[in-house]
């Protein structure tokens, strides 16, 4: 199994210097991205990621040059060439290359596309099912985190603060309301019902989040309510968990100094994690 990198139409050696110093993605974080799980040698929920990618590009005014079929073929080529069975594909599209200037001329820019496929440490992924610690931090991101850009400085700082405190990640609060994690969405369980922040401009509409809302929870007969909730609700929740592309459903067993669900993964959380893993193994275009 070989990890591969693909840039603007050709495979390149790992570490190759292929990105221009005038690339707006490098200079300004002026680019969008997606991360897709590879499960049993297939992309999981690729069409969902593509839909979100195209939306991000429209919101960023980056021209769409490739069809969904073209992108699907590239993902399949990366998997075939690498022979990776369990991993992820990273895709980034920048606005293009031009001398540094904040404003851009769309007609003079050609989007630049980078893709890479990497192995996943499945032992580490499986261990997440045992539960993680999180810390609470203020949400200092901009007002359009629903657009998946590489402009991630607040996320980076929050994640670094969390890891320095030996936590898996940070749970973010904006004006007292729990929005999401530094790299994930957040769910709370109370009296058998799932709660998560509405999909507005203050959260990223996570693909795993969508799987829980629209497929996994309904298949288990679990009600989901999208509503804002505060720290008091979080502290009173029976269970808490994160969702993201790599880890799936990730039980939270400690928030700051407080144990969650008795310091072990909650029963509903584990049911959701197991059902999601089954869906991923079965596959979804």
Task: Identify what each model region corresponds to.
Residues 1-77, 99, 103-285:
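Helix-start/capping segments and mature chain N-termini
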